[in-house]
């Protein structure tokens, strides 16, 4: 920056210096790390409605920080074995080893899924999945990921696939979650290996010259952050000096002074669940469920244990299905966290789909520790099962509430951006060598605008390359009132079957024509002129552009073609912005 500023004198020097100082003052004090202009900030807060009708708004910029425990240990061990499906098909499957195997379960130490991910039973080298995760977690307002290296593996095969995706979007200006690690077993050796493989790797640095900008830095030191045992005699001095090391904190161990918790048992929802001094990087954990009673989620799933499931609240597990679907346990913890107002919240977790089958416990022939089935699991990633994207959307909204994020657009905002190169093909193998292919990417949406001229709204959408025609082509979805009315919250759709045709929701995937908008199509841009009266004379709305989606399937906004923004989230427009 100094070299750049040196070429300016007089007026220009003063202007640029003032801008730089303002930028640092506003955004840099808490992080104490290099900053890049983040495109996602230009989009303001996103909003949407989940399957339960709950309204969601994403966070704006804040000094508060949110980290996410991120798991990359899913490599193919056969199957796929899906515990929820196995027991649903044969309730006696957990009676014995023989019954388990006969019902389609896997042997000891094999990975078993607690349920089916929305993206399929993927493995940790599927770059298509990482591309989705990068968008979802950036949109959610997650500030940093913590890779689970607690079992002394550093997952170089997985990160060799993930890092290029993260780096691509970081360089493009997106404020992607920064990266860090959590060690426990053989902590010193593991931290040494992590340092050598990622932080002090000349070959990696040559491939990604700005890689240092991707490492999460703890606020009180500005050093790259890692969780581990700084007193481990195996830890090399240069590694100890390089990192800001916070102590690995297990939920069933005594509280460490500088601990970093990944879950709480006895300290759950008490003042003892805060680690560190407020204003100095204090941190609390929130998780989808806790295996506090038996330390075996399978015990509560199948054998009468009383671990805190997803449906736990008010000191008991609630049998009401809405407690499970609505994340009662998750909600209760977030409510408590906001009362104590720490600087950092660490969420457990995301993409923790698998657990290894463990040796039998007396009276419990089939044992899993961290996750067992839909109820007794803690993942916030969207599921192909009954949870759908409820927990992801809830996480987005809870992050916004914790950060006291913006509920409305920034003044003058009428330009919106989407991630480029998010229509890449998928041709991968998952667990059990299951093939996963997706070639639905067609038009890569990049930039959108909205403005009002007199009695009409003018919307544009641009794509990276010339527009390609086809079914379910470049459709505009509008939520006119911010509620769950219409189809999945969308009250109007434009261009669903005929370019320019405005239709109003008649319930489910049924639509009634309202009129024709003027439409201009040229090369890589579409312009719509929609009379405001066709949209009920609204002064603001939420909207999404989607191409090559699956009609009537809201989850195809995650999985098919291109949706801007992704999933159920929408951009927000208000005349007050102009």
Regions found by a protein language model. Give the residues of each.
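N-terminal Sec-pathway targeting helices
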Residues: 2-18
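Glycan-processing catalytic domains of CAZymes
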Residues: 33-416, 513, 530, 536-538, ...
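Acidic/polar low-complexity flexible segments
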Residues: 409-418, 477-497, 523, 533-578
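Low-complexity, acidic Ser/Thr/Pro/Gly-rich terminal tails and inter-domain linkers that flank the onset
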Residues: 430-456
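Beta-strand-rich interaction surfaces with strong enrichment in secreted/lumenal proteins
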Residues: 446-450, 514-519
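Short, well-ordered beta-strand segments enriched in hydrophobic/aromatic residues
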Residues: 455-465, 526-531
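Beta-strand acidic-aromatic groove motif in beta-rich domains, primarily in extracellular
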Residues: 469-478
């Amino acid at each position: 920056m100094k070299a750049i500023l040196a070429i300016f004198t007089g007026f220009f020097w003063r202007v640029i210096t003032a801008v730089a100082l303002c930028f640092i003052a506003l955004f840099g004090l808490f992080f104490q790390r290099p900053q890049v202009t983040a495109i996602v900030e230009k989009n303001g807060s996103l909003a949407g409605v989940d399957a339960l009708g709950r309204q969601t708004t994403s966070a704006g910029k804040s000094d508060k920080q949110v980290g996410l425990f991120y798991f990359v240990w899913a490599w193919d061990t056969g199957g796929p074995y899906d515990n929820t499906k196995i027991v649903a098909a044969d309730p006696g499957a957990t009676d014995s080893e023989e019954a388990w195997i006969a019902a389609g379960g896997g042997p000891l130490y094999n990975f078993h899924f607690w349920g089916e991910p929305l993206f399929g039973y993927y493995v940790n080298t599927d770059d298509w999945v990482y591309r989705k995760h990068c968008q979802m977690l950036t949109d959610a307002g997650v500030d940093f990921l913590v890779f689970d290296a607690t079992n002394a593996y550093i997952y170089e095969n997985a990160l060799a696939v993930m890092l290029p995706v993260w780096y691509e979007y970081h360089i493009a200006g997106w404020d992607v979650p920064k990266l860090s690690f959590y060690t426990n077993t053989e902590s010193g050796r593991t931290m040494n290996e992590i340092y050598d493989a990622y932080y002090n790797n000349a070959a990696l640095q040559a491939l990604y010259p700005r890689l240092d900008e991707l490492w999460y830095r703890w606020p009180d030191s500005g050093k790259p952050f890692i969780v581990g045992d700084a007193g481990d005699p195996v830890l090399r001095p240069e590694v100890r000096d390089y990192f800001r090391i916070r102590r690995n904190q297990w939920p069933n161990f005594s509280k460490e002074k500088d601990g970093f918790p990944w879950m709480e048992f006895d300290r759950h929802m008490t003042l003892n669940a805060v680690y560190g001094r407020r204003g100095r990087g204090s941190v609390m954990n929130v998780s989808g469920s806790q295996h506090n009673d038996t330390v075996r989620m399978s015990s509560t799933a199948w054998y009468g244990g009383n671990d805190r499931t997803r449906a736990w609240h008010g000191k008991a597990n609630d049998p009401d299905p809405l407690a499970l679907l609505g994340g009662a346990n998750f909600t209760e913890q977030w409510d408590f966290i906001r009362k104590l107002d720490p600087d950092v919240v660490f969420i457990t977790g995301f993409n923790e789909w698998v657990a290894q089958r463990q040796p039998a416990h007396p009276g419990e022939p089939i044992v899993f520790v961290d996750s067992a089935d839909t109820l007794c699991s803690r993942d916030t990633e969207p599921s192909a099962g009954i949870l759908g994207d409820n927990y992801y959307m809830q996480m987005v909204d809870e992050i916004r509430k914790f950060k006291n994020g913006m509920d409305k657009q920034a003044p003058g905002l009428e330009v919106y951006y989407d991630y480029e190169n998010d229509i890449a093909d998928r041709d991968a193998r998952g667990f059990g060598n299951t093939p996963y292919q997706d070639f639905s990417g067609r038009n890569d949406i990049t930039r959108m605008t909205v403005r009002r001229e007199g009695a009409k709204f003018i919307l544009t959408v641009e794509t990276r390359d010339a527009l390609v025609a086809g079914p379910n082509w470049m459709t505009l979805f509008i939520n006119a009132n911010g509620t769950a009315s219409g189809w999945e919250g969308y009250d109007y759709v434009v261009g669903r079957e005929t370019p320019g045709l405005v239709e109003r929701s008649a319930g489910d995937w049924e639509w009634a024509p309202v009129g024709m908008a003027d439409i201009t199509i040229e090369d890589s841009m579409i312009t719509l002129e929609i009379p405001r009266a066709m949209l009920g004379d609204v002064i603001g709305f939420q909207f999404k552009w989607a191409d090559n989606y699956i009609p009537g399937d809201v989850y195809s906004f995650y999985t098919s073609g291109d949706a801007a923004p992704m999933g159920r989230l929408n951009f927000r427009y208000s005349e007050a912005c102009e």
